[in-house]
């Protein structure tokens, strides 16, 4: 409990001046196939509500409906429509969010994806499907699977252009 990547506890790498390891400054560039899953469209809404959780069943169904296949090495981005609230209703934007559940995170990690991101500030649904645990998808992806988490990804242009697969470049 309260462990990070490779089972490390924060006391092993967090100092008052920053991180001694696991810092974003140590991240190598990522160049990979990107896949955008439009979860808002999957649920038939322009924007998902806070607390809407998507897991492996919803991820598989959305990928199938979009006729895309998730593969090892992919960067998977989720469009929920939530990011638009950051401009129009910042208090609501920060009060909760739709997002990935632990089962969905485990599924993606076991596929061998490199990174998972969304147009939300924290990737996990809040409130989530596990009332006793905060950010279980983060824990699954980062600590157990070694998968990078990307937040506040602006997916609106990709959705507007009908893009589902693309070259993802970070770094």
Regions found by a protein language model. Name each.
Residues 1-171:
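Active-/binding-site microenvironments in catalytic and ligand-binding cores
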